[in-house]
Amino acid sequence: MHFSPALKPGKLLKRYKRFLADVQLEDGTEITLHCPNTGSMRNCLFPGETVWFSTSNNPKRKYAHTWELMTTPTGGLIGIHSGNANALVEEALNKGIITELTGYDSLSREVKYGDENSRIDILLEAAQKPACYIEVKSCTLLEDGQGYFPDAVSLRGQKHLRELMHMASLGHRAVLLFVVQHTDIHSVAPAAHIDPEYANLLKKAILSGVEVLAYRCEISPDEIHLAQSCPVRV
């Protein structure tokens, strides 16, 4: 995924009201960005460090600028836009990068499924093969060298694990795919210290036949894309 038009830099001042962040430009001007991340963004906020943002030409938008990347104090990059995860996975599937998920003829997004009124992020289908239901989660929390998900208690995430277990019980292929949008994360683990119920459900899901994958992103101010798989430590 290429950033076009090119991203612009600024210095993070603060994030507030969940969806807003103030930054300072090189000329000293302060502007407000839309923050496209509903999570806690735990360990992803570094006031004074460089952020990268995109700009929309849509005159109807209240906030024209969108926060895309955060630079860490060690020079790493974090993909702030959690909504990009699905598009990154679709792009990687079309290029055959996710080798565990090749051999399908069609890809659909946001299809209703399960018994808790959910929509699957990605549905892969092919003749004479079980349908493949993929839930995509963006992982950005780094603590003591380990990547974790979720970064806050996630009832929605718990529901999605139950839905995947249900689909696996029906004979479908059910996959949880972590998209690692943090260049310093090299493995993913359930955050039992944050959401113990999610961690327990993940173990049950694996025993129920749900596949769990994780892929790291290569990130720069020019582009972001899925690059290679990394371990999931349960």
UniProtKB/Swiss-Prot annotation:
Signal peptide: none
Gene Ontology MF annotations: DNA binding
InterPro entries: SfsA (IPR005224), SfsA_C (IPR040452), SfsA_N (IPR041465)
CDD domains from the UniProt entry: SfsA-like_bacterial
NCBIfam families noted in UniProt: sfsA
Family label: Belongs to the SfsA family.
The protein's name: Sugar fermentation stimulation protein homolog
Lineage summary: Bacteria, Pseudomonadati, Pseudomonadota, Gammaproteobacteria, Alteromonadales
